[in-house]
Amino acid sequence: MTTIKVVKICGAMESRGLNPLDHLPPPASSNKPLTPFSITDILSKPTVKRFHRIHRLPASDRVRQSITVSRQTLITQASPLCALQELASKTFKGLELGVLQAAEGKDGLKLFGQRDSPKKRRKSRTAFTNHQLYELEKRFLHQKYLSPADRDQIAHQLGLTNAQVITWFQNRRAKLKRDLEEMKADVESVRSTGLVPLDKLAKLADLERCAAAGATGNPGPQCSPRLGHEYKTVHKLCLSPMSSLSDHTSQDCSEDEEVEIDVDV
């Protein structure tokens, strides 16, 4: 019967030119409001609506609603992205603090490890007088190594300390050794190209004699005198006051050979 009545009503309405769907009740509204899916609507609009609802609610309900919103805000702030941002911020703050402390000298050793110990300051070199150099060179010609008695005698005679005498003889032996090695290399290079000039052979022979003279610690023969230009050149090498001896700030003296030795006075 009900179906027949509905059909009759629909037929009567159609005969009058009316649409039966216009008289149907509106559909029940959904519990969840339809919202756009843009980032702005997702992040902003629900918060605005919540605040509008809070103002419309009574005072007691407003307090509860505000507590709920605060909890949701805390949950949002506790998201992984916020936690990562907070961790990065703390890390950079710690680094900035560490750099400032290191710049001010605070806890510098703890941050960057133990610092290297400062290098030992080199002692000032002695500038020998011409008289001292002459006597030292004359003694060096026939005695390359000094006994303790000879060392004390020279130091007392020239007004030097035992350490200064020892250091000078060490540097002088190193200088003679370098001169001899350079002369040998020069002779070998010339020999490979052809005949060796006699003056180079003469210089090499006299340098070897000077190196061998007094090498055992006992006085030996001096450089053998030669006539002509060869003897003058070699004698100049053996006797000339060198820049490394007159001014100990020069680099001619070997740094490896210059060793300070403790001497019992």
From Swiss-Prot:
Binding region for DNA: 121-180
Location of this chain's protein in the cell: Nucleus
GO annotation terms (biological process): convergent extension; muscle cell differentiation; regulation of transcription by RNA polymerase II
One Gene Ontology CC term in the entry: nucleus
Primary location group: nucleus
Keyword annotations of the record: Developmental protein, DNA-binding, Homeobox, Nucleus
One Pfam family per UniProt: Homeodomain
GO molecular function, one term: sequence-specific double-stranded DNA binding
Residue spans crossing the bilayer: none
Disruption outcome: Morpholino knockdown results in decreased myod1 expression in the fin bud of embryos.
Function: Transcription factor required for the development of hypaxial muscles.
Name of the protein this chain belongs to: Transcription factor LBX1b
Gene name linked to the record: lbx1b
